[in-house]
Design a protein with these regions (language model features):
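N-terminal, Lys/Arg- and Ser/Thr-rich interaction peptides
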Residues: 1-21
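Generic beta-structure capping elements
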Residues: 8-10, 116, 159
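Extended, compositionally biased
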Residues: 41-117, 123
Length: 160
């Protein structure tokens, strides 16, 4: 059963893997990003989203932004050492480990995603296409989501 979702936002970043340190977006939304966006609206182990088509509804425009990011991570080894009686700090002071990074992102994005879903072996006996279709439609109409809907970064929210 096909589902069509219109999404738009001020900014989007579909990061190219070959750009290591600075984020540079693909020109359009990737199928995996569209699948992730739909999963943020409704996720269920008995359902797998399949992207059929992504239509670009606005001109492709880029802009450069600078973002503050935390450069450090808390290592698992450090956590284990403290749990076993060692000493150390188990926090990151964002003000001490902040760095600015440039990103080339898309601006004023607008897409229509055509998708469908397939049932997986993890579906319960009472699960069926009609049930999932109704749940997804209801969640989209009410603006509900399973997790925060965003274009790759939680700081780049989207509207559906």
């Amino acid at each position: 059963m096909p589902i069509q979702v219109e999404v738009w936002g001020d900014y989007a970043c579909f990061t190219r893997p070959e750009m290591k340190t600075e984020r540079v977006s693909y020109d359009v939304m990737t199928p995996s990003a569209a699948r992730g966006l739909l999963e943020s609206v409704y996720w269920h182990p008995g359902l797998r989203w399949m992207i059929d088509r992504i239509r670009v509804c606005s001109p492709i425009r880029f802009t450069n932004i600078r973002r503050n990011e935390v450069k450090d991570v808390i290592s698992a080894n450090k956590v284990k050492a403290v749990m076993n009686g060692g000493t150390g700090e188990l926090y990151l002071a964002a003000s001490e480990s902040i760095q600015q990074r440039a990103a080339m992102v898309l601006r004023d994005v607008h897409y229509v995603i055509d998708a469908h879903f397939e049932m997986t072996p993890a579906a319960a006996p009472g699960d069926n296409h009609g049930k999932f279709q109704d749940i997804v439609k209801r969640r989209l109409e009410r603006g509900q989501c399973y997790s925060t809907v965003s274009y790759t970064h939680l700081t780049l929210p989207t509207k559906a």
